[in-house]
């Protein structure tokens, strides 16, 4: 976040440079952070969540950003149990996420959902809910999910990170999206064990 660097350049302590910002960009580093922690052998539930929240606080220190960060962390970890995305979202009972609305929205054109009902802008919590709409509707098709998200415009980049990580965690990423990545062989997958997933949910 540019404000982080402005504050840091102005002499503020590193951990005090975040601002009260509630944009979905706050969530963009969470999938990579969780994968990195796993790669270093860090799987303690309280450590995972605190690491995520510490990262988000450092740039987007706002209740809506921290709430969405917690929910995304819960969702990504819970998906490792093998349940479908729709089953997992239903079971987690995420605050502000209506399963009834997700069921209704999946029958509508995407622009009626993200554009008319929900804003295409970056502001949380609507942008997180918009990401969940695409992850729910296209739960078994990574390509369809990310392309549908791109087509509605707005802050589709950060929404794409969120919904892409959710669908990829459940079904992986098609080879066509990975071709040409020079460091692919060194990239660990997000594969937290079932026990960690369950413990994290209890901790929250």
PLM-predicted stretches and their roles:
Residues 1-204:
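Structured, active/binding-site neighborhoods that engage oxygen-rich ligands
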């Amino acid at each position: 976040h540019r404000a982080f660097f402005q504050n840091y350049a102005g002499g503020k302590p590193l951990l005090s440079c975040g601002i009260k910002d509630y944009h979905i960009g706050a969530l963009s580093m969470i999938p990579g952070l969780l994968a990195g922690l796993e790669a270093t052998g860090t799987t303690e539930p309280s450590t995972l969540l605190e690491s995520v929240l510490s990262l988000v606080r450092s740039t987007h220190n706002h209740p809506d950003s921290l709430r969405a960060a917690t929910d995304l962390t819960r969702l990504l970890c819970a998906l490792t149990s093998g349940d479908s995305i729709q089953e997992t979202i239903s079971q987690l009972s995420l605050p502000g996420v209506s399963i009834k609305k997700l069921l209704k929205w999946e029958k509508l054109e995407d622009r009626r959902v993200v554009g008319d009902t929900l804003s295409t802008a970056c502001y949380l919590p609507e942008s997180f809910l918009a990401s969940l709409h695409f992850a729910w509707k296209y739960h078994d098709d990574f390509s369809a999910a990310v392309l549908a998200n791109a087509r509605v415009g707005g802050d589709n980049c950060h929404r794409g990170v969120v919904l892409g990580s959710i669908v990829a965690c459940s079904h992986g990423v098609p080879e066509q999206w990975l071709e040409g990545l020079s460091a692919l062989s060194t990239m660990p997958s997000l594969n937290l064990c079932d026990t960690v997933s369950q413990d994290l949910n209890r901790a929250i």
